[in-house]
Regions:
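Acidic, surface-exposed loops and disordered segments
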Residues: 1-225
Length: 225
């Protein structure tokens, strides 16, 4: 097994950080690695906002009350960005069509790929982090806080810093439930209940709801919880 694969398999979210600065040299390495992620047609339809200011992190916390935001050495906001595409298109045409869902997917996937590269790079340097998708639930307020222009939107945030907590890698679904040969295999309730038990064994006394209950809370209503 290569060192890269070992690092990937050891991934765990970190939400508590030591009070220590993340040096610019390391941050540049992390962001450069992020930029080398795959991108649809090399459009690179995302931007990253680096947040070091405690005042700005506190303001974001008021919108998205996740303690990792305030504790982080650096908070990265990954932005789906078609504003750059608009500027480029203006060189050749008077019209710009962001393409609805397709444009949303292009920029979201580009941002996600860059984000995964960034987190992996950070972990390789000894840092930890956590993805914060709740910024989408306050997208208008977050956009205003960070002065986002037209054709941009917050996809997710990433809190980074030196870990100040230790816990085990969270068990994933069995590979046979997410990887299928040649065609899709329908999910079974028995398999989901089995994974509920695996998650319960992992969480122990910390568990308040099962994995499938959290699915119901998220997808059992029209609006996200």
């Amino acid at each position: 097994m290569t060192e890269t694969i070992k690092l990937m398999k050891a991934h765990k979210s970190v939400r508590r950080f030591k009070e220590q600065v993340l040096p610019q040299e390391d941050l540049t390495e992390i962001l450069t690695a992020a930029q080398m992620a795959s991108s649809w047609k090399n459009f690179q339809s995302y931007s990253v906002i680096v947040v070091r200011s405690q005042e700005k992190k506190d303001a974001l916390y008021e919108l998205v009350p996740q303690e990792a935001i305030r504790q982080s050495a650096v908070f990265l906001l990954f932005v789906g960005d078609l504003n750059r595409a608009e500027k480029g298109a203006q060189l050749h045409t008077d019209t710009f069509q962001p393409q609805g869902v397709e444009g949303l997917l292009i920029s979201s996937v580009d941002a996600a790929l860059a984000g995964q590269n960034a987190l992996l790079a950070a972990e390789s340097l000894g840092y930890g982090g956590v993805i914060i998708g709740l910024v989408r639930y306050k997208s208008e307020e977050v956009a205003e806080l960070f002065n986002l222009p037209d054709y941009t939107y917050p996809v997710f945030g990433m809190a980074l810093g030196l870990p100040n907590e230790e816990h085990e890698v969270k068990p994933r679904l069995p590979l046979t439930q997410v990887v299928f040969e040649e065609e899709y295999q329908e999910q079974t309730v028995d398999a989901i209940e089995a994974y509920d038990r695996v998650q319960a064994d992992y969480a122990g006394a910390r568990a308040t709801t099962s994995w499938s209950q959290r699915l119901a809370e998220q997808f059992g209503q029209a609006e996200p919880s």
